[in-house]
């Protein structure tokens, strides 16, 4: 269970840092070496290594890596109407919100004869990594696939570990089809990321890879982003987390449910409650104990709760300060004066306002993206959006008159920096025909 209540007012600066400390991410030299070995095998042996590693780690001997269009068609027939409707509804919701993010080119004439343009273009090829654990994750397919589709990436490749029969879940294939993804491969783990970075006989390399994964996948993404020229990753990955700010009028059952919904993700997940009401905190603690027994993943949630926090603050203003310092992945506000708090909150991956806005809605169907910065990265990294699937570059066009108007400035600054060739690139143009 969660450790006893923490009174923020009574903590020293060092104790406050400890109270907000996140679970340590294992940094193993052995892991690094193991992943480096996998990457080397894929780089040098291509498909042969992929098939061998899949048999080694997934226990399945595959004859092919590609998923056929016939398999996708069969998946549509295999799912119930109810399951299909849910996937389509989530797709529609996510597409609706993300469609509004489409960027337009910006052109400014900074001075007469000097035109500057900011252009946005889709990344040409992207890879989407979809984990496969105890259940399929079609929501992750949609959260990654919809932005890629709307941005207009020329190639979108999906990789996912095969099940014990060498297949991908029907939900994965249906969600991928909705997003217009036709390149689908049954490969997972570090070897999948290596295939996307280096390319193999079957899987062409991509420019950028997206998606969560275990520590082998995370390590592979990190190593490859540093080794392969032009290969990028989405964002640093860490354990899932949620922070709730609540006042005395909040519903303790709702709060407990929200905290447990994150705790069940993994034993390294962290959940935090900040409140100015000791009575509410006590009620939430009781609710957690009661609801925990109802969960199929209660053992996992129970482990996560050991590194979680129930914090009593002087007032809600102090709760906001603590939240901004922590910078949670998910931030839930359940207070009567939520708009006032919202205006002061700066660091969060995604914010959920009001009693009827569970974090689960954002995970699946509200329309926002559930790929969010964790481990405090919300202070510097944004939630996933169309911007992550595109890149921007500038274009400038200058007339002779425009260059003449800038010449004095450029000549003086190049003189200050001692860059004669830069200066001459300007003067030679103005001397011509003068």
UniProtKB/Swiss-Prot annotation:
Binding site for NAD(+): 129, 191, 214
InterPro entries: Ald_DH/histidinol_DH, Histidinol_DH_CS, Histidinol_DH_monofunct, Hstdl_DH
PROSITE patterns: HISOL_DEHYDROGENASE
GO molecular function, one term: histidinol dehydrogenase activity
SUPFAM superfamilies for this protein: ALDH-like
Binding positions for Zn(2+) per the UniProt entry: 262, 265, 363, 422
Catalytic reaction list: L-histidinol + 2 NAD(+) + H2O = L-histidine + 2 NADH + 3 H(+)
Note describing how the cofactor binds: Binds 1 zinc ion per subunit.
Active site, per annotation: 329-330
Pfam family membership, one: Histidinol_dh
Domain of life where this protein originates: Bacteria
Chain positions recorded as substrate binding sites: 240, 262, 265, 330, 363, 417, 422
Family: Belongs to the histidinol dehydrogenase family.
Name of the molecule in the record: Histidinol dehydrogenase
């Amino acid at each position: 269970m969660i450790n006893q209540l923490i009174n923020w007012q009574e903590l020293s600066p060092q104790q406050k840092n400890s109270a907000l400390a996140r679970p340590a991410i294992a940094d193993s030299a052995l892991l690094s070496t193991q992943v480096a070995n996998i990457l080397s095998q894929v780089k040098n042996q291509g498909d042969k290594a992929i098939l061998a590693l899949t048999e080694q780690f997934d226990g399945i001997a595959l004859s092919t890596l590609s998923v056929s269009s016939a398999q996708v068609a069969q998946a549509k027939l295999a799912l119930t109407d109810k399951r299909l409707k849910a996937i389509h509804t989530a797709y529609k919701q996510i597409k609706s919100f993300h469609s509004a993010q489409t960027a337009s080119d910006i052109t400014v004439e900074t001075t007469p004869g000097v035109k500057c343009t900011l252009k946005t273009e889709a990344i040409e090829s992207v890879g989407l990594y979809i984990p496969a654990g105890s259940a399929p994750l079609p929501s992750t397919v949609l959260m990654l696939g919809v932005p890629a589709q709307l941005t207009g990436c020329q190639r979108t490749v999906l990789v996912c570990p095969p099940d014990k029969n060498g297949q991908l879940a029907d939900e994965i294939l249906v969600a991928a089809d909705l997003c217009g993804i036709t390149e689908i491969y049954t490969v997972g783990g570090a070897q999948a990321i290596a295939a996307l970075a280096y390319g193999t006989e079957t899987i062409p390399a991509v420019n950028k890879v997206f998606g969560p994964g275990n520590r082998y996948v995370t390590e592979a993404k990190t190593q490859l982003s540093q080794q392969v020229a032009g290969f990028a990753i989405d964002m640093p990955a860490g354990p899932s987390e949620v922070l709730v700010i609540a006042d005395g009028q909040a519903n303790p059952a709702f709060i407990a449910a929200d905290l447990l919904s994150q705790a069940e993700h993994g034993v390294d997940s962290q959940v935090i409650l900040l409140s100015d009401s000791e009575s509410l905190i006590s009620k939430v603690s009781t609710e957690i104990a009661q609801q925990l027994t109802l969960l199929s993943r209660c053992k996992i949630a129970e482990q996560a709760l050991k590194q979680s926090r129930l914090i009593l603050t002087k007032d809600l203003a102090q709760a906001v300060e603590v939240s901004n310092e922590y910078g949670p992945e998910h931030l839930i506000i359940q207070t009567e004066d939520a708009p006032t708090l919202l205006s002061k909150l700066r660091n969060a991956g995604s914010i959920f306002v009001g009693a009827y806005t569970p974090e689960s809605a954002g995970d699946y169907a509200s329309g926002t993206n559930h790929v969010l910065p964790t481990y405090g990265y919300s202070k510097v990294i944004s939630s996933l959006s169309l911007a992550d699937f595109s890149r921007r570059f500038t274009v400038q066009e200058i007339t002779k008159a425009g260059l003449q108007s800038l010449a004095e400035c450029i000549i003086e600054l190049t003189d200050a920096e001692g860059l004669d060739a830069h200066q001459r690139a300007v003067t030679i143009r103005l001397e011509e025909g003068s």
